[in-house]
Amino acid sequence: MAKKVTAYIKLQVKAGQASPSPPVGPALGQRGLNIMDFCKAFNAGTQKIEQGLPIPVVITAYSDRTFTFITKSPPASILLKKIVGIQSGSKRPNTEKVGKVTRKQLEDIAKTKELDMTAADLDAAVRTIAGSARSMGLVVEG
């Protein structure tokens, strides 16, 4: 018989830095899941990703207090800020530009996020990422 799913927990945890402190501890603790098991498994699973990069994770909690989790690619805004070298996007993106991004850089980000996006092809994914860049106050070249 299949295990009964009791909850889906969505979090953003820094790669290789999962610890029992918030947001991980309270989210898993209130569902009765073993926090340290998740932290060890998550940190082992994100070893190859740059440390400190926020990684979205979806944890599936089961009725017998076990869990599984799926990690996703980092948010596009984080990747864009990293490539351009800025701390935050523009407060007024239509009038105040904070940096430039090329089509090649957008393609690299789209390839990284390809599995998590619903875009039909790479070009559609690039257009989606370009929209995110524009809304952050970045100039899209190419």
UniProtKB/Swiss-Prot annotation:
Domain of life: Bacteria
Gene3D superfamilies: Ribosomal protein L11, C-terminal domain, Ribosomal protein L11/L12, N-terminal domain
Gene Ontology cellular component list: cytosolic large ribosomal subunit
rRNA-binding in keyword set: yes
Entry-linked CDD domains: Ribosomal_L11
Keyword Ribonucleoprotein tagged: yes
A Pfam family of this chain: Ribosomal_L11_N
Keywords, comma-separated and alphabetical: Methylation, Ribonucleoprotein, Ribosomal protein, RNA-binding, rRNA-binding
GO biological process, one term: translation
Entry's family note: Belongs to the universal ribosomal protein uL11 family.
Role of this protein: Forms part of the ribosomal stalk which helps the ribosome interact with GTP-bound translation factors.
Subunit structure, as described in the record: Part of the ribosomal stalk of the 50S ribosomal subunit. Interacts with L10 and the large rRNA to form the base of the stalk. L10 forms an elongated spine to which L12 dimers bind in a sequential fashion forming a multimeric L10(L12)X complex.
Name of this protein: Large ribosomal subunit protein uL11
Lineage of the organism: Bacteria, Pseudomonadati, Pseudomonadota, Gammaproteobacteria, Lysobacterales
Gene designation per UniProt: rplK
